[in-house]
A protein has these predicted regions:
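A short pre-motif secondary-structure segment
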Residues: 151-154, 195
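Catalytic-core segments of nucleotide cyclases and related cyclic-nucleotide turnover enzymes
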Residues: 173, 191, 206-237, 242-249
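Active-site-proximal alpha-helical element of nucleotidyl cyclase-like catalytic domains
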Residues: 116, 130-151, 159, 183
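Active-site-proximal structural segments of metal-dependent nucleotidyl cyclase/transferase enzymes
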Residues: 94-126, 140-142, 153
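Regulatory loop-to-helix N-cap segments in sensory/regulatory domains
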Residues: 35-55
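Conserved nucleotide-binding and Mg2+-coordinating catalytic segments in signaling enzymes
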Residues: 74-93, 114-128, 136
Length: 249
């Protein structure tokens, strides 16, 4: 009934193949395959082993479907519905694993905190639908500026956090500048025409500048606000003198 499920159906090997598709939600979720010696076994449709396997598949499908649904729900809970990016909950749930891997490899994580400049004006002038478009387009631009192995998190509102795993020294600043310049040049198409925006970015590297990952995020955020104070549309790297200022503590 499903000749394309298993390529062994079309093979010329001197073996007997029986493949039982596991169909859940109208889709094939897996295949159980039996391999028999033709000389010692003949299939008549009533073999007990195949029958038991079919019964097992039927009984287990509901459990498999339930687990898949739970995984889907769990994944959706970790993603921002607007941009499709991971959210802060993902960061909270998976930070320990990320940090352990980086420390084991004796590498650094580059952190880039990004915030769209004067984003509130977009919502006020054009409405929230246009604001949503700007956020989605910004997320796509950032994706194109970083490596596929890097992570982007919608940290809140118009703020994005980029985590660059196993980054070489100096590369964080280069990527941050690439993001800044690309967004500055971008023309975001909306229903009423085109919008141009700029972005401010603060950077920090873990564990180079602090042994606490969450403090590294704080440091990147402090650098971001220094970029805002210095006129926006800038990349600022965190320095220890920023943390010493009471304003940020």
């Amino acid at each position: 009934a499903y000749p394309d499920v298993c390529r062994q159906f079309r093979s010329g090997f001197e073996k007997m193949h029986v493949c039982i598709p596991m169909i859940t939600g109208g889709k094939i979720g897996g295949v159980i395959q039996f391999l028999f010696d033709k000389k010692r076994f003949a299939i008549d449709g009533k073999d007990k082993r195949i029958y038991k396997a079919e019964q097992y598949v039927k009984e287990s499908l509901s459990v498999i479907e339930a687990k898949r649904l739970m995984n889907t729900l769990r994944e959706s809970a970790l993603k921002d519905s607007l941009t499709g990016l991971y959210n802060r909950r993902f960061l909270q749930d998976h930070t320990e694993t990320l940090i352990a891997g980086v420390l084991r490899r004796e590498k650094n994580v580059g952190l880039i905190m990004c915030d769209l400049d004067f984003f509130k004006q977009v919502n006020d002038l054009y409405g929230h639908n246009v604001g949503d478009t700007v956020l989605k387009e910004t997320a796509e631009i950032i994706k194109k500026c970083i490596r596929s192995s890097d992570l982007i998190i919608r940290f809140g509102g118009e703020e994005f956090l980029v985590l660059m795993l196993d980054i070489n020294l100096g590369e964080t600043a280069k990527i941050a500048e690439k993001i800044r310049s690309t967004i500055e040049k971008a023309k975001i198409k909306v229903s009423d025409g085109v919008i141009k925006k700029t972005i401010s970015l603060g950077i920090c590297e873990f564990p180079l500048e602090t042994e606490s990952f969450w403090q590294a995020i704080k440091f990147a955020d402090i650098a971001l606000y220094r970029a805002k104070e210095n006129g926006r549309n800038k990349v600022v790297r965190f320095s220890s003198d920023m943390w010493a200022e009471k304003t940020y503590q």
